[in-house]
Amino acid sequence: MTLTSKQVQELKSLAHHLNPIVLIGKGGLDEAQLENINKELLHHELMKIKFNDYKSRKEELAEKIAEETGSEIIDIIGNTLIIYRKHPNPEERQIKI
């Protein structure tokens, strides 16, 4: 799924008020974290992930998260990642872009 710049801007504005749902701490990014991110993406579609640790590797971890979950990186602002994945069921999609 490739997003246009207009779609990315719309998603950024929708994400502005969101709080981070997942925190990447000293335990790092493991299989349980990826499972949790997948579950949250299915429920929310658009979410924020905060890097409390591994701040120097946030771009690398963001790529891994996007690859493993099939999501799109919308932006990394400070130590917060914004990702989006369309719900597989069109009737359950909360975000229409």
Protein language model annotation of sequence segments:
Residues 1-97:
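Positively charged, polar, low-complexity stretches
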